[in-house]
Amino acid sequence: MVFDLIRKFVGTRNDREIKRIQSYVDAVNALEDEIKTLSDDQLIAKTSDFKGRLANGSTLNEILPEAFAVVREASMRVLGMRHFDVQIIGGVVLHEGKIAEMKTGEGKTLMATLPVYLNALTGKGVHVVTVNDYLATRDSEWMGKVYKFLGLSVGMIYHDIPEDERKAAYSADVLYGTNNEFGFDFLRDNMKFSNDQMVQRELNFSIVDEVDSILIDEARTPLIISGQAEESTDKYYQVNQLIPQLKKEQHYLVDEKAKSAALTDEGIVLMEKLLNIENLYDPANIETLHCLNQAVKAHGLFKNEVDYVVKDGEVVIIDEFTGRMMSGRRYSDGLHQALEAKEGVKIENENQTLASITFQNYFRMYNKLGGMTGTADTEAEEFSSIYKLEVIVVPTNQPMIREDCPDVIFRTEKEKFDAAIEEIKELNEIKRPVLVGTISIERSELLSKKLKKAGIKHSVLNAKHHEQEAEIISQAGQPGAVTIATNMAGRGTDIVLGEGIPELGGLHILGTERHESRRIDNQLRGRSGRQGDKGSSRFYLSLEDDLLRIFGSDKISPLMARLGMEDGQPIEHTMVSKAVANAQKKVEAHNFDIRKHLLEYDDVMNRQREVLYALRREIINTENGKEILLDMADEVIDDALADIADEKIYPEEWDIESLNELLERQFAVHIEKPNDNDLLLQGSTKLELEHCNREKLHGAVMVAVTRAYEAKEVGVNTDFMRHVEKVIMLQVLDALWKDHLLGMDHLKEGIGLRGYAQKNPLTEYKKEGFDLFSNMMARIKEESTEYLFKVQVNNEVEMADEFVSKPQNVVEHRGNTNTLEKPVTIRRDEDKVGRNDPCPCGSSKKYKKCHGK
């Protein structure tokens, strides 16, 4: 009550922000008449003028009003479109690195030209991120006319773009592309062997279109680049043939809430009998157990025409948020192979991860990040806590007059669809257009059959028809149009009302099921009533819908009984709508916890990735790989002497034999103890044990190792030797990183079991992950030095081919959506790291100069 009164007099934070930004709008409007008088050449010259002012110390905020006024005028001359005041407000929000929520049809695409132009003046590049190639192409060509008119370069990246064109695109002032392409380019760059091969430059400023879809809906599935593993696919066929003998509830359990499936004790016993295995959990049978678990998931959780389709003999994933086919993408960890076995198509080899990153961690690397969408306010807390992004709701240019009717709910799905068909029929008779939203291909095709039976002409837009997506959705507002669309397929394309449609009430939205997220439902509703148009929406639900069955039945079923529901009769009551909304809030909170928890796990990998990639860049950028190599040698010697030359014992008792074995194996350097008093290095350098300590021994060994390496360099072209050093260190690093990723996957897979031992799984994951990482960093040094000290570099012409980075046969795909245990925040255990390694704290300093002091 008190807060309501305060808000009434002071306004919300959103109100205060809009009021503050209004001063920018007034400044832009004040310049409009002056800018209009400029000739085309004078308007174009403003770009050079702005760049000069920035070079002389002006800030972007200082030139913002004039730059926005220039873009507004350029847009009028080139596109015939003038930015509304609300679009200027949205432009300022984006420029300040926040999220602008603007209702559908308010002109987000045009709004983005304002901050894009302003920030592109710095010469550091601006990335405009879209959800699909169609929108990237459309916007780069459409809005690109404004940028090009003002003298800025525009680029676009897509999946099959040639490498030289991709690199050129990244040097453009403004670059359009999909979230997947930007993420994969980052991963690919960190697998390259020279700066010349890399395409991305510093990640400066990004504006993410449909930001909720990219940063929230897709946050749980990582981008993965993988190479083929060598495991046989036969086990998937073998196990798949046994699955039909399992009975649900008796032999395996499915938890739809947690999206997991697992064998029961009875199921394990049956499988051991069928496979003729004594103990399924014996380490020797771990691969069989893994295949079995994935097969149970494939049969128990994943449905054809809902989660995937079979097209041209391949299992193709359906994006659960957009309803689009994700050709070329594969589930990881053997799940895709299990689905291929289930559907009886050819099983492709399992992939092993070479590089991966989540969108959460990729987009947090930009110096500045902004986003725009029609629906973000419901997820404001998540944007704030994970991305440090504030959501500002931008007012509409025209008042919203769409009528959102209460939900109607039926007992069964059949009753629901029958009633929906009846309403579509009534509206179709008066030629009023209807957009019908479904949540899966299966449902859209079921509804399509019913409409055909009723003789109603209609269009279907789902993953199977995505090629005609823009055309189908753009016609959805024409007289008599009935369009069935899965989820938000067609998002980003305007639905323009045909002649006479506003008089009929505008476009009617008919939702056939509530989505887990209120935001997705709001997106569907938002297709109607754009820019002050008339429109209406209504959702038809049944107690058999997944959302109500899984999350809301305990509250809604008794409510229905209390309201006296009869077969075939719907209930339309605010109490029902409220109960449905509460079920959605419950799911949203559950999914937020999962994403937040997954981020805590991924942050462990992210810290390691940052350190590893920093070392990789250091090797690539150095002009003298020999220095890094000798630093590595110094670390290897230091680690060895810490064990062998213990200062707590007399030098005469040091295990020189073990030290000699290591030096000969690692560096081809010899040390011996000819008598009780002396050490002899390389047969010439003499050390008296009586006056020796670990530091002196370290120094002498390092001198001998350096000389041995310099002797190897004699007669070899210096530049070629430096090239060989780089390539070998990078090859060793990449091979060990690949193995480390596999080890981390295995660790993550089994870490949940630590909870049974009263240990926190996240704490254990951090600790053991750090141990694995420390061991990998030590092995990088050991293997790099051993290889380079022993390799014979005789004839550079013969060896040139061997030391050229070759393109790898890799697959790019999205990972699986996983769930993990509830988190407990914990400080990481610091373990031993080499003195010259980058500090795992992320400071970018060497460990010895940071936390290793």
Enumerate the predicted regions with their spans:
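Conserved P-loop NTPase motor core
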Residues: M1-G564, Y613-A614, L630, E635
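Generic detector of short, well-ordered, non-transmembrane alpha-helical segments enriched
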Residues: L5, E379, R432, G480, ...
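Extended, charged helical/alpha-beta scaffold domains that provide interaction surfaces
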Residues: I35, V309-V316, T322-R329, Q531-G532, ...
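Active-site-adjacent structural elements in folded domains
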Residues: A112, A420, V824-I826, G834
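Compositionally biased, intrinsically disordered low-complexity regions used as flexible
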Residues: N180, T819, R835-N836
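Short Cys/His-rich zinc-binding micro-motifs
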Residues: D829-K848, G852
